[in-house]
């Protein structure tokens, strides 16, 4: 509720700054970015190599998001710093579904790992830029295992949705399963992350030309909107899996 109010208020401010009485879609888009990611830091300068790494990282997210049908849809990619992030990929769910299939979680894990996969493929090493991606991917995998019963452990709920000290053990939680089960939870979370990682790497290897092309576009334009992304994918004939 509070976030929606913030988005609406920020959109109204943006419209007023342009002397417009009506709020347009672009105002909501820009306000969502500001509320979720923080204000633009156009004066924030980074080294050329870091800028190149960020371009490939964000391109990796965008390409995986496009290729996997159940991943969140990518609407914008930018290498302009916002908040603490050096770049960002704005992705939103395609539909407001009340029921989320297992494949959507799996595809979203792969999309989140797409940036790190691009770094590894192009620069042969990874950076700290994927720390938030790893946190979110691990959270999805943990919920798949312990909350939704979407793992090889079967349809069973294993713990509450709170912060965990370890992957399979929660802080202040009354232990309802053995150390052996906790270890299996850890293994399942790691397996789901590994599956997503291998999927991201394989897809980017297959579409390496697209990765280079999009990174180059980002380095030249800094931001790619919906239409820019569609043009890249259409020009290079990139089809969804």
Descriptions of predicted regions:
Residues 1-26, 33-41, 62-74, 144-151, ...:
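AAA+ ATPase "lid" subdomain C-terminal helix
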Residues 49-56, 62-241:
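Soluble catalytic regions of large protease machineries
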């Amino acid at each position: 509720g509070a976030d929606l109010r913030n988005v609406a208020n920020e959109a109204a401010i943006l419209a007023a700054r342009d002397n417009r009485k009506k709020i347009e879609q672009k105002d909501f888009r820009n306000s969502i970015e500001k509320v979720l990611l923080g204000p633009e830091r156009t004066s924030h300068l980074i080294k050329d190599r870091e800028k190149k790494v960020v371009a490939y990282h964000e391109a990796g997210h965008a390409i995986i998001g496009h290729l996997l049908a159940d991943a969140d849809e990518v609407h914008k990619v930018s290498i302009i710093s916002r908040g603490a992030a050096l770049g960002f990929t704005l992705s939103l769910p395609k539909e407001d579904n009340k029921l989320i299939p297992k494949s959507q979680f799996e595809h979203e894990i792969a999309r989140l790992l797409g940036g790190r996969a691009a770094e590894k493929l192009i620069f042969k090493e990874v950076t700290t830029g994927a720390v938030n991606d790893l946190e979110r991917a691990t959270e999805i995998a943990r919920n798949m295992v312990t909350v939704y019963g979407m793992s090889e452990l079967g349809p069973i709920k294993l713990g509450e949705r709170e912060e965990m000290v370890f992957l399979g053990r929660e802080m202040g939680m009354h232990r309802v399963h053995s150390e052996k089960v906790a270890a299996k939870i850890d293994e399942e979370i790691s397996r789901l992350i590994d599956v997503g990682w291998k999927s991201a790497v394989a897809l980017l290897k297959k579409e390496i030309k697209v990765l280079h092309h999009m990174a180059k576009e980002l380095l030249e334009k800094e931001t790619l909107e919906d239409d820019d992304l569609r043009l890249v994918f259409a020009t290079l004939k990139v089809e969804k899996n």
